[in-house]
Regions:
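Ser/Thr/Pro/Gly-biased, low-complexity, turn-/loop-rich segments
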Residues: 1-205
């Protein structure tokens, strides 16, 4: 009869340096199967000043990967979450641009914006408009270092309007008013609310 022998060896450990804007920076002993996300978890995660978009994995003095947590959270992509090797360093820099979106979007909160991203990108991160949002324009409040500025951005400029650190985007609600509604009451066969159009402009119709 055939015999199969299985030997279970000890999993090799590696030392990984986690530096920068994390809760507990330091050198960690991890299993050789560890990834960048796992190392960040052991360091307590990114702190309030840290970037979630531009985390570097450095090996032998060279950057070999960039971790963008948004790619994983919002798109399910984990291309930067590579397997680590002994001596690797994970460096979390401060965030570059943090903006707030408030009002009638599905996920109103602060978002970190990467270089080249626009107002349209931010609306995508925020889950897009709610059903009762006013979509034709939004209001951006910006700090210029001395005072505040207001920018009214129309919808045809969403994909071109670049946001800067400290911007606040406010999405309003539709006005509760109808553009083509008429209500008929009194001595008619059917009272009610009807559509008003170019072809219907008298009660008899």
């Amino acid at each position: 009869a055939s015999e199969i022998k299985v030997t279970l060896g000890q999993i090799r450990t590696i030392k990984v340096h986690v530096m920068g804007e994390v809760v507990k920076a330091g050198t960690y002993s991890l299993s050789s199967f560890s990834t960048a996300f796992y190392a960040l978890y052991h360091a307590g995660g990114v702190n309030d000043l840290g970037s979630l978009r531009n985390i570097s994995v450095v090996r032998n003095g060279k950057q070999i990967a960039v971790v963008d947590v948004y790619d994983f959270i919002l798109k399910g992509q984990s291309k930067g979450n590579i397997s680590l090797q002994d001596g690797d360093a994970i460096i979390v820099p401060p965030y570059h641009s943090l903006v707030e979106v408030d009002g009638n979007v599905k996920r109103p909160m602060f978002y970190e914006m990467a270089e080249g991203e626009t107002l349209n990108t931010l609306l995508g991160y925020a889950g897009d408009f709610t059903g009762d949002a006013y979509r034709k324009s939004v209001t951006v409040t910006r700090k210029n270092g001395r005072e505040y500025q207001i920018h009214t951005v129309d919808d045809d400029m969403y994909s071109a309007f670049a946001l800067v650190d400290g911007d606040k985007v406010e999405v309003g609600r539709m006005i509760e008013r109808f553009e083509n509604r008429i209500e008929v009451k009194g001595a008619v066969y059917r009272e009610g609310v009807y559509q008003l159009s170019e072809n219907i402009n008298t009660v008899s119709k």
